[in-house]
Amino acid sequence: MGIPVRSLLVASIVLSSIALHVAAAKNLDPYKVLGVDKSASQRDIQKAFHKLSLKYHPDKNKSKGAQEKFAEINNAYDILSDEEKRKNYDLYGDEKGNPGFGGGNFGNREGYTYFTGGGAKTSHFSSGDGWQTMGGQGNTKTFSFSFGGGNPGAGGGNPFNFDFGDVFSNIFSGGSMGGSQHTGSAGKARRGTKSSGHDSSSVNIQEVTMQIFNKETADQGITWLLLFYTPNTKGQFVLESVVEDVARSLDGALRAGKVNCDHEKALCKKAGVSIGKSARLFIYSYTTTEKGSLHEYSGDYDSKSLKTFCQEHLPRFSKRVDINQFSFPSNIIPNLPQVLLLSAKKDTPAMWRAVSGMFRSRLIFYDAEVQDVSHPLLKSLGVKNIPALIGRSVNGEEQLLKDGISVKDLRSGIKELKNLLENFEKKNKKLASNQAKKPAHTDQPKENKIPLLTASNFEEICGEKTSVCILGIFKSSKAKENLEAVLSEISQKTLIRGQNYNSGNAVAYALLDGNKQSAFLSTFDKSAFKSSDKLLLAYKPRRGRYAVYDNEVTMEEAERFVVSVLNGDVQLSAAGRKPVLR
């Protein structure tokens, strides 16, 4: 039966159109398309592709020619990311017009063989152009195009078989659609080259299993970028590229990992992450709590946006203080040393936030902005240059750990700070151990550790994290000495100590100058303060209630008052307002 002339004519037109598309695409120099040199590394090629594909993605760029440009970019990357294809292009299809498909000289044996695959609306070309050696007769090479069936968001079918809704999809992925042996092999080869296209020198994105998550991620104090995906999800490739860029720029402050939810179903279920058509990116951070939690990233897929997101989610365990009003609190958390970073930064430095997460349950962190070293505290400790690190040991001694701290990048800075903090922590463990071993000497005066309550340390000592704040209020130096000795003795007694600060069940002790803080005292019972040289005030910040003891302050009576407050045996009065120190 003869073939109708009209059908032959239509087929001829279609084939001619396809051939023109192919020739035009192949005539473009992939190096020029991506804007890289012939000596470019795989990493350079990958970065160029990432940048251009985001710029010309049809979902974001609606200008005329963006879709065609996007196809050219993907086509160029498909060549240069595959070492075999790149080698063949350099030999036979470079911009100088050497014999080969890329130079426009088809020669003999460079013709096309058209055949139809088994899938609907799918057609294939076989060409001897040097793109991919597939074996078989004549070293025939194949690539495929799809008519119709494109991404709905791309405005109809696209002739290059790209999923324009996803720049990460495999280039020329028609291998599984057609019935051709050649096309299937080409598809497998191209899928295999996606992983090999990554530069080995790039930041390692670790495969995270349940075991690794429990051992290295969960509540370890380190911030993680975690990419959740399955082999069929879209977006993984470019997301990995962006994650690599950010992990490299924040190297030391965070780690990067990926979770295959097909293999790690239990981990993804535990994390509460379900995967649909697209990969999902989360940060595991400690922004507000002692325990880590996942926060999903929903911003643009570019390094700048993701880096900003990561910086916002770095740990915040360091309290920003005013150096002019700062003094180390003395008895907030027993046996925990305290550290203060002095820098010229207006905000808490990223490296200090990072290490505050790593040491969050082992040290108490502060930081302050300092523009010069003329402050009395800095002079007394011998600080000559900033940045500087000051520590307060468990025995109350304040010391300069290091000044003039110089680092070349974030990673080296974090390493330097970690070394300083680890050494300081070891010394304090020895101090605490030695103090525990020493016998008590009743004939020696005990060291007084009761701080003076000021505006700068009020929230730390008597803020809402504290259950009960016991204040010794004095109006003379003699009264101050007496109250300091009494409260220091009481604070050391285990029965009423109750200083579990992290759980919010702390009993804090402090002294208050009644002469200077009359406005603060006016919040409470004014009559008691007028006639007394010294008295005790028990204040519960969360409830805004208080009790006053204004009789003779002896060790026995003071202890009885504190125990009564803790046991709820004393009736508390409501404060007129929240007390404020000046």
Curated annotation (Swiss-Prot):
What keywords were assigned to this record?
Chaperone, Coiled coil, Endoplasmic reticulum, Glycoprotein, Signal, Vacuole
Spans annotated as Disordered: 178-201
The record, for InterPro entries, names: DnaJ_domain, DnaJ_domain_CS, ER_Co-chaperone, J_dom_sf, Thioredoxin-like_sf
| Expression induction or repression | By dithiothreitol- and tunicamycin-induced endoplasmic reticulum (ER) stress response. Induced by heat shock.
Output a single Gene Ontology CC term carried by this record. endoplasmic reticulum
Tell me if Transcription is a UniProt keyword of this record.
no
Extent of the signal sequence: 1-25
Q: What is this protein called?
A: DnaJ protein ERDJ3A
Q: Which gene underlies this protein? A: ERDJ3A
Asked whether the UniProt record includes Coiled coil among its keywords, one would answer yes
* Subunit details: Interacts with BIP5.
State the organism of origin: Oryza sativa subsp. japonica
